């Protein structure tokens, strides 16, 4: 009789835990997000955070950190597609296993690095605002930053709002459309 009672108590526990925590493929987190602010124990002297973008491609479980390689703030390798997983409110980057809590508020994403207790002052929070670029502006499958392009300066304004030195460079960064000339600030 005791075994039957224990079995009746254990079975609901087993079934209540199964299948409730699914991998999040949040469709609302899609496309261009522009960095607005960073909160950390670090110093940014009049830094323009909006030069940095994060692009989400949930159908492919990919994201791309875009910005100036020499002066950018990135959560992944700059301008290269990276696999990710969102599970139970945590964004995990496959390439380096860094984890961030992710909070989605209407047109805003807040990423907070999950602190490593063995490292002092590694707390950092990124606040991104939804951008206006078309979802098909960047194709992560077309990114090939190892493409050899000429150094000719023939600037183009990419659909992502960045000025690229020439059309070849824009295409190698996965930009699907651009206009001749520099982007206006």
PLM regions: where:
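Sec-dependent N-terminal signal peptides
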Residues: 6-8
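Lipid interaction determinants
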Residues: 21-79, 87-136
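Extracellular/cell-surface secretome signature
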Residues: 134-185
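C-terminal motif of bacterial Sec signal peptides marking the signal peptidase cleavage site
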Residues: 15-16
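Positively charged n-region of N-terminal signal peptides that target proteins for export
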Residues: 1-4
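Short linear motifs in intrinsically disordered
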Residues: 80-85, 99-101, 140-149
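Repetitive helical segments and hydrophobic/amphipathic motifs
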Residues: 11-12
């Amino acid at each position: 009789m005791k075994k039957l009672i224990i079995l009746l108590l254990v079975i609901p526990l087993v079934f209540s835990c199964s299948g409730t925590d699914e991998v999040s493929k949040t469709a609302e987190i899609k496309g261009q997000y522009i960095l607005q602010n960073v909160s950390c124990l670090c110093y940014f002297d009049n830094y323009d955070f909006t030069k940095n973008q994060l692009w989400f491609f949930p159908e492919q479980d990919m994201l791309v950190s875009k910005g100036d390689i020499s002066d950018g703030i990135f959560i992944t390798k700059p301008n290269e597609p990276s696999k990710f997983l969102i599970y139970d409110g945590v964004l995990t980057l496959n390439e380096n296993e860094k984890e961030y809590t992710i909070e989605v508020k209407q047109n805003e994403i807040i990423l907070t690095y999950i602190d490593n207790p063995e490292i002092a002052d590694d707390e950092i929070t990124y606040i991104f605002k939804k951008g206006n670029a078309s979802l098909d502006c960047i194709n992560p499958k077309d990114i090939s930053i190892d493409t050899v392009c000429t150094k000719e300066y023939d600037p183009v304004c990419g659909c992502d709002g960045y000025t690229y030195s020439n059309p070849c460079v824009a295409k190698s960064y996965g930009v699907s459309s651009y206009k001749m000339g520099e982007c206006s600030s």
